[in-house]
Amino acid sequence: MLFIRMLRRAGQSPACGCWTPVLPVRFLGISPRQIPADANFHSASFSDTDHPRVLITGALGQLGVGLANLLRKRFGKDSVILSDIRKPPDHVFHSGPFIYSDILDYKNLREIVVNNRITWLFHYSALLSAFGEANVSLARAVNITGLHNILDVAAEHNLQLFVPSTIGAFGPTSPRNPTPDLCIQRPRTIYGVSKVHAELMGETMQSRFSMMPQSMANSSATWKPARDCP
């Protein structure tokens, strides 16, 4: 599909401090519009008037800057807005629009979407496993309440929404090699639990709002520093 292929190439674009995928991965994507199965990112035609307006939450994590670099090459620097609660390094700040965004502040999220005419939303904000286990209440808030805010604003404003899952959504009792799409998951971390919740919420949004979910699960082993790539 268009966005899955686009995301695979995003990771292939070397960027300072970014990581590059070396294995295929899957995302939870939610869209109120169907995309043709044979759509291709590079063959798709976008005029100046129908360029997507993109917001990336949690953009200072492992994936955001690399994705932004790809999207900005395709749609223009000003069409892609990075957001986070941390101060960006100089090279990120000067590369294109960056704003402060706390996903727990629903009113602020709505204002950002409306004021910037956002049409695509990549939701990367999350507390990962180790930090989440040490801060369970904060992980619940960011990974679950924050997700609900993102889902609500996406439904309200008819956005294309993309949320990554994780290999951590599976547990020790999950079947392996290969792991089927539908199987026992039973994760052992709050991060994994929150991602299972996100996957199930995607299915719920599909049934309630005719959105279209896909799932992507990846692990840290899926990624390696861009400097190590040929």
Swiss-Prot record:
Q: Which InterPro entries match?
A: Epimerase_deHydtase, NAD(P)-bd_dom_sf, NAD(P)_epim/dehydratase
Q: What is its main location?
A: mitochondrion
Q: Which UniProt keywords apply?
A: Mitochondrion, Transit peptide
Keyword NADP listed: no
GO CC aspect terms: mitochondrial inner membrane
Keyword Mitochondrion attached: yes
Tissue expression notes: Expressed in all tissues examined. Detected in most cell types examined, but not observed in endothelial cells, glioma cell lines and some leukemia cell lines.
The organism sits in which domain of life?
Answer: Eukaryota
Cellular compartment(s): Mitochondrion
The family assignment reads: Belongs to the NAD(P)-dependent epimerase/dehydratase family.
Q: What is this protein called?
A: Inactive L-threonine 3-dehydrogenase, mitochondrial
User: Organism, per UniProt?
Assistant: Homo sapiens
The organism's taxonomy opens as:
Eukaryota, Metazoa, Chordata, Craniata, Vertebrata
